[in-house]
């Protein structure tokens, strides 16, 4: 069955402009408080102008164009402008530094870059090293350096007509994007995402939170990340809703933004929930229109209950990864929710728990979470120019090995245990980092926590805890270890404690454990 009706992204935007016209499609708020609004008609015109800009710079179907941008309207223009002419977007994590960004440019074969002035010096250095195919840079800022091969994105775009000049034949199987994984354990891999993937993601994610055209979906997730693109933006646009894109997350500003824009759906990660909870309570905390808060792993039950009670919201759990495109397991619309379950498998997918020999396990037994989808349609197509890595995780019949451990119950609710690489082997016992982190996070003085395994000559691995304290708090080792001993089995109690000001995170808020080992 063809869920998307054979419609690629160019057709999608032309239809949206016709159907929704002057209805608000996109609101962008910068960190400085500047707000830009676009109707569906205006946004389609900006997308067309951007597509024409790329065409005048020599970009054709199949060419790769990198974006190194924070959340901004230009990201949306470029994303869909490239798709309209069959070119391929390569978003770069805005937190990456020179060597990491150069590596993605090299391995994606990007020939053009759109970025802002704050990142330009880094790319000057990359160009001088002459190790990439990059031949031109467009800067979104008005002020331009006097360099060859650099253009003003805004000036060039505004010179273009609002109708599309170049419209090559497109297929839903065409690649729309190469999205490099966050690489918390190794070098990033380029996840190939098709037009079909993005169109399907829109319909699926809109179904998951029952989006309507009168909804307002607000996110602070980075636009270069799969959550923002496929769970938020594609869902909102596919439903004809209003999409609110905030440049960066601020714990002090976020709830006010939810209220100001009358958001009905938003999404949170644990870091956001924890930092919101340490903000001063307000009598207005429950004065909002939120129907759903999309939530991604992992939170203790105490933290969940406290957040929901204070803000008067409910969490809609969703589990997925870049390779699955969407939250393939999650709470279903109208279905019961069973915390701490991550929900049930969504439509168009199958899910199993498998053992180390790739055999399905019965309910209650822990193994690897495996997902069956259709490559290039409901799950990613492949890793770019990396068939060995693709074959390692994706079977010929569409079964994807997630690398996550979990189990299911008799009613097919699934439960996440941990990343396989986050299991600590301690004296013959397997210890889940997430389990320990959820227990330790309940300590009233602790704001953030991560545990890792470090080498131990006697017991394979020892457990070390890194904690960030709430402002003004102090915590002795004696108090910390006593709390652990009272709340977990003896073999799970950490051997070491380190108190830090912050923890290293990637763009999606996940802690980069390898930086702590």
From Swiss-Prot:
Stored Gene3D superfamilies: 3.30.300.30, N-terminal domain of ligase-like
Keywords: Ligase
Name of the protein this chain belongs to: Crotonobetaine/carnitine--CoA ligase
Entry's Gene Ontology molecular function annotations: acid-thiol ligase activity; carnitine-CoA ligase activity; crotonobetaine-CoA ligase activity
Entry EC number(s): 6.2.1.48
Family membership noted in the UniProt record: Belongs to the ATP-dependent AMP-binding enzyme family.
Pathway(s) annotated for this protein in UniProt: Amine and polyamine metabolism; carnitine metabolism
Keyword Ligase set for record: yes
Function, in words: Catalyzes the transfer of CoA to carnitine, generating the initial carnitinyl-CoA needed for the CaiB reaction cycle. Also has activity toward crotonobetaine and gamma-butyrobetaine.
One example of a Gene Ontology biological process annotation: carnitine metabolic process
Enzyme class, first EC level, given as a word: ligase
Top-rank taxon: Bacteria
Result of altering residue 98 to R: In strain: O44:K74
PROSITE patterns: AMP_BINDING (PS00455)
Catalytic activity: 4-(trimethylamino)butanoate + ATP + CoA = 4-(trimethylamino)butanoyl-CoA + AMP + diphosphate; crotonobetaine + ATP + CoA = crotonobetainyl-CoA + AMP + diphosphate; (R)-carnitine + ATP + CoA = (R)-carnitinyl-CoA + AMP + diphosphate
């Amino acid at each position: 069955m063809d869920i998307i009706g054979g419609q690629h992204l160019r057709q999608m935007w032309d239809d949206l402009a016709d159907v929704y016209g002057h209805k608000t499609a996109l609101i962008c708020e910068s960190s400085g408080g500047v707000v830009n609004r676009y109707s569906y008609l205006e946004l389609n015109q900006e997308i067309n102008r951007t597509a024409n800009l790329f065409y005048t710079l020599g970009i054709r179907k199949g060419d790769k164009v990198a974006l190194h941008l924070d959340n901004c309207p230009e990201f949306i223009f470029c994303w869909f402008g490239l798709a309209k002419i069959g070119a391929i977007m390569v978003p770069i994590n805005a937190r990456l530094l020179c060597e990491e960004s150069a590596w993605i440019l090299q391995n994606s074969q990007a020939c053009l870059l759109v970025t802002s002035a704050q990142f330009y010096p880094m790319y000057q250095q990359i160009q001088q090293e002459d190790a990439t195919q990059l031949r031109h840079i467009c800067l979104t800022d008005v002020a331009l350096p006097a360099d060859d091969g650099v253009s003003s994105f805004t000036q060039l775009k505004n010179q273009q007509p609002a109708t599309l000049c170049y419209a090559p034949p497109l297929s839903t199987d065409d690649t729309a994007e190469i999205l490099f994984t966050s690489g918390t354990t190794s070098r990033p891999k380029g996840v190939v995402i098709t037009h079909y993937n993005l169109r399907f993601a829109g319909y699926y994610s809109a179904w998951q939170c029952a989006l309507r055209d009168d909804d307002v979906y607000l996110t602070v997730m980075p636009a270069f990340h799969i959550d923002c693109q496929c769970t938020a933006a594609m869902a909102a646009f596919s439903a004809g809703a209003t999409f609110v894109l905030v440049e960066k997350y601020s714990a002090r500003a976020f709830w006010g933004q939810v209220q100001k824009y009358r958001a009905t759906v938003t999404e949170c990660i644990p870091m956001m929930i924890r930092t919101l909870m340490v903000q001063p309570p307000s009598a207005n905390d429950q004065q909002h229109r939120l129907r759903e808060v999309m939530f991604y792993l992992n939170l203790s039950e105490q933290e969940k209950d406290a957040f929901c009670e204070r803000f008067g919201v409910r969490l809609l759990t969703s589990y997925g990864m870049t390779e699955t495109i969407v939250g393939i397991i999650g709470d279903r619309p109208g279905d019961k929710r069973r915390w701490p379950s991550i929900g049930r498998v969504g439509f168009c997918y199958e899910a199993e728990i498998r053992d180390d020999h790739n055999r399905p396990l019965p309910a209650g037994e822990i193994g690897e979470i495996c997902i069956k989808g259709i490559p290039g349609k409901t799950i990613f197509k492949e890793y770019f120019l990396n068939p060995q890595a693709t074959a390692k995780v994706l079977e010929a019949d569409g079964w994807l090995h997630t690398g996550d451990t979990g189990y299911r119950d008799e009613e097919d609710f699934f439960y996440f245990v941990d990343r396989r690489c986050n299991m600590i082997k301690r004296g013959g016992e397997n210890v889940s980092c997430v389990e320990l982190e959820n227990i330790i996070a309940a300590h009233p003085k602790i704001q953030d926590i991560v545990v890792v395994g470090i080498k131990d000559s006697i017991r394979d691995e020892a457990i070390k805890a890194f904690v960030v304290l709430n402002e003004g708090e102090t915590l002795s080792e004696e108090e910390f270890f006593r709390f652990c001993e009272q709340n977990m089995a003896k073999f799970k109690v950490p051997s070491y404690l380190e108190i830090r000001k912050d923890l290293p995170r990637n763009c999606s808020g996940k802690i980069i454990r390898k930086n702590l080992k």
